[in-house]
């Protein structure tokens, strides 16, 4: 069976080496009588998996010692609620930067617990007579004086917009970031953040796990009505095992962390990701048949949306069906958008992007 390249925004491809290792270890059930999917999270065997995976993640991101790593459930949407419940404290407001769909979704949830100060950072920027989506410089974000924290999403998966600049503000702010679609794609200066959270299903592992990295001094501030399963202090005190965690997703994520270390770490991964993105964006920009409407300075390295210049529902469906015949799947854009989207996370090999761009050139030649 030929390899299928999955360009879906998530769940995404897993590294082939990780899938093979998991297959081998599951096959050992015949010898051991039990598999990693069946063991207790309290067992010595799984405790070793949990500790190793946490340490490997700390090594990859160079996480300082005054941060806790939590392995949770509920996805990023769960964190949209957990963040204000844990961090607002006695304050009533927090700064929320909007740049796309997911940051707006975080705001909708935050409104249940406080009054978010909404800063619209999106802007349409003219380049050679054409307007492109972009993001205002961080220096122009009008933050409030009394906000408990500032929340933003460095990579918007639907629009394909990224905020590459680090969050440096003129006065101290606890910064909270939704890194769901870009975590582990490049080095992160963790100590610039109070909280980092990410759903696993893009760059970490399979769906079902959520990683939260929280600075120690932000623990113990949760509202009294915060559900225990979302309370950072409770999760930290119980080593992320207040309830039964998604053990198999945690185990597979641990294998991904080891794979990333074996590849040379995040500097090497970032180099590969830039190579893949450059190949895809160049194909789009050099061919009038395709269009990406994000300013080059804010293009995502993970999610590349594009449309056909002569787009019709029939032509779009033809593009998707012919791509699927070539083992290129998951290219349909999000339901809230139109056109196509290629998500090229860490596990997507450069060969997959090469195969996609070759198909795109061929399709444009035939139908352009």
Curated annotation (Swiss-Prot):
Catalytic activity: O-phospho-L-serine + 2-oxoglutarate = 3-phosphooxypyruvate + L-glutamate; 4-(phosphooxy)-L-threonine + 2-oxoglutarate = (R)-3-hydroxy-2-oxo-4-phosphooxybutanoate + L-glutamate
SUPFAM superfamilies for the chain: PLP-dependent transferases
Residues the entry annotates as binding L-glutamate: 42
Gene Ontology biological process terms from the UniProt entry: L-serine biosynthetic process; pyridoxine biosynthetic process
InterPro entries linked to this entry: Aminotrans_V_dom, Aminotrans_V_PyrdxlP_BS, Pser_aminoTfrase, PyrdxlP-dep_Trfase, PyrdxlP-dep_Trfase_major, PyrdxlP-dep_Trfase_small
Cofactor note as given: Binds 1 pyridoxal phosphate per subunit.
Disulfide bridge positions per record: none
Major subcellular site: cytoplasm
Keyword Cell wall biogenesis/degradation: no
Description of how the protein assembles with itself and partners: Homodimer.
Name of this chain's protein: Phosphoserine aminotransferase
Organism whose genome encodes this protein: Hamiltonella defensa subsp. Acyrthosiphon pisum (strain 5AT)
Gene field: serC
